[in-house]
Amino acid sequence: MKYALKIIHKAQKDLDSIKGKDFNFIKKKILSLSSNPRPFGCNKLIQEEGYRIRAGNFRVLYRINDFEKQVIIYRVKHRKQSYR
């Protein structure tokens, strides 16, 4: 069953600052989450609720609401910033 994608305002600002090939690759990864919100290679976050997937040099941070069938994207960060 497909999940609805919801992008929080901060994540949208993060995406707006990314250009070119990186943006297209991240967009493709985010869209794939609607059919499989827990793909191979996703990591469950330890310090906060949610998951992380790699998209090149960027990390997409998101939460899954199985009850409402939603994937909520809350941050898209460069890998250097996401591990701080």
For the regions a protein language model found, what residue spans apply to each?
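A short, surface-exposed loop/turn module that caps and links secondary-structure elements
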Residues: 28-54
